[in-house]
C-alpha cells in the first residue's frame, strides 16, 4: 500500500475564482479543471477516511479512490490513497456522510501547481479556497496577489469538517 506525506498549505482567495481562472486561461497557466465528489466515513479517531470520485467532464473516465489521511496539526500529513473501481467506490460511499462537491482548477505558477476549489453544495456556495503542495515543510513560497488569509491551521476549512456542515439529504454518491 502506497503511503505519501502530503505537505500542503491552504488559503482564501482575495478575488473571485472565476476572475483568476479566466486570467490563467488567457495567459496559458491553466492546466486542468474537473469536478470532485467526496464524502467521509464517520469519525474514526486518528484517520480520516474519504471516498472520492473525480469527474473530468467527458474528457476521460471518472476515477475513484479511497484515501486514509492521518489527522494532525501542521502542514504535513500522512496520506494513503487506494484506487477503487466504480463498484468499490459505490459500496464505500453508501457508508459515508453527505457528499462534498467542488470544482477544482489547477493553475501553474512558477514551479508550483495551485489548486483552486470552488464549492458547489448550496450550503457552501461562495466558499473558494486555493491549496498548494510543497516539496518540504520549509519550502519557500511566493504568494500570488490573489491569495488571502491562510487557512491551513483552521480546522473549519478542512474538507472533512466542511462535509459535516452539509445537510444529511445531500446525495450520497
Where is each model-derived feature located?
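Phosphate-end processing signature that detects enzymes handling 5′-triphosphorylated RNA
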Residues: 1-173
Amino acid at each position: 500500500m502506497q503511503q505519501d506525506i502530503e505537505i500542503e498549505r491552504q488559503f482564501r482567495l482575495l478575488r473571485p475564482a472565476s476572475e483568476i481562472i479566466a486570467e490563467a486561461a488567457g495567459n496559458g497557466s491553466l492546466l486542468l479543471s474537473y469536478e470532485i465528489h467526496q464524502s467521509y466515513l464517520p469519525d474514526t479517531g486518528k484517520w480520516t477516511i474519504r471516498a472520492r470520485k473525480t469527474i473530468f467532464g467527458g474528457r476521460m473516465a471518472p476515477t475513484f479512490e479511497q484515501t486514509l489521511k492521518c489527522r494532525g496539526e501542521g502542514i504535513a500529513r500522512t496520506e494513503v490513497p487506494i484506487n477503487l473501481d466504480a463498484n468499490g467506490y459505490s459500496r464505500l460511499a453508501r457508508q459515508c456522510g453527505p457528499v462534498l462537491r467542488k470544482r477544482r482548477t489547477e493553475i501553474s505558477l512558477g514551479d508550483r501547481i495551485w489548486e483552486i476549489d470552488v464549492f458547489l453544495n448550496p450550503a457552501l456556495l461562495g466558499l473558494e479556497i486555493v491549496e498548494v503542495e510543497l516539496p518540504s515543510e520549509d519550502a519557500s513560497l511566493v504568494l500570488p496577489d490573489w491569495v488571502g488569509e491562510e487557512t491551513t491551521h483552521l480546522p473549519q476549512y478542512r474538507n472533512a469538517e466542511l462535509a459535516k456542515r452539509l445537510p444529511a439529504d445531500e446525495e450520497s454518491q
